[in-house]
Amino acid sequence: MERIAIIDGNSLINRAYYAMRNPMITKDGIFTQGIFGFLNMMEKIKKDYEPAYMVIAFDLKAPTFRHKAYEGYKAGRRKMPPELAMEVPILKDILRAMNIKQVELEGFEADDLIGTIAKEAESCGMEPLIITGDKDELQLATDITKIILTRKGVSEFDLYDRQAMMDKYGFTPTQFIDFKGLMGDQSDNIPGIPGVGEKTATKLILEYGSVENLIANVDNVKPKGVKAKVEEHAQLAMMSKRLATINTQVPMDIDFAEYKLTEPDYDALIELYSRLEFNRFLKKLNVQRSGGTGSGDPAAKPLAVDAEKLEKVCVREDSQLA
């Protein structure tokens, strides 16, 4: 089963940026620590998991369907610092030079694109690996789809599939959405039920299974204080669950042949690495270009594209979702 690495671009560069104690700045004043950490993370993923395919999903500034459904969605979240904002377009240039596909779509978050690609990949017989620092994406875990969640900066990860979710939380990845619907999410300003925290939300999910079933059986809820909260804020819980649910049916074209890892544009990449003063990456790239393998990174090996195999890989156009 071939693997596809689906990376949450905004989440990972943000974590990489804040993981560095001291800023990295070139002599020309370009901040680079977010890019540097992101590239290190990509190297680790390629080395440890050897994906045949890779795609990076990014958020756009435009409001999404969640902002339209709830005006307060993500209100109060701190803005990206200008130093990090400076790094994002440079990272995208590097990814283009690497011939790694990037996806973004107005009206949707990167989470939704990731969920849609992962679901399609699994249906095509691939093994999706979702790399993120966002716990929201744990709801996408299955027996096949794995979530690689950054634990400390971007150098340490926890791996989740459906069973790992059950072991840690006691409920399924799908029920993780109900869990967030009850307790909310401060980082996204999803309200949940006021006064219901992690412990109570877990107890209610384990007992009733879903927000809908909890509301339908509210007369049986104990203690009375929790019952009163559920009765009063039932609609808020339902809205919160909708906000927390990742859309896995985004109308987008998916052609896995475009996600195949291939050789980079060496000249473009060397120019970018030189400007960013990434000497270690430059040295490794030169070894790769001369036919070496760098430090054992499978991405440094020429990846031949099997045309016959690619013809069998799913290609989905958004018109097929009608």
PLM regions: where:
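Short, hydrophobic beta-strand segments that form beta-sheet elements in well-ordered domains
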Residues: 127-131, 282, 314-316
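Non-catalytic nucleic-acid-binding/docking modules located in mid-to-C-terminal regions
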Residues: 50-55, 100-101, 123, 142-146, ...
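Conserved DEDDh/DEDDy metal-dependent 3′-5′ exonuclease domain
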Residues: 53, 107-109, 133, 309-322
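Noncatalytic, basic helical substrate-engagement surface that gates or grips nucleic-acid strands
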Residues: 1-131, 135-162, 236-239, 245-253, ...
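A short, flexible N-terminal coil/short beta segment enriched in small residues
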Residues: 75-78, 285, 318-322
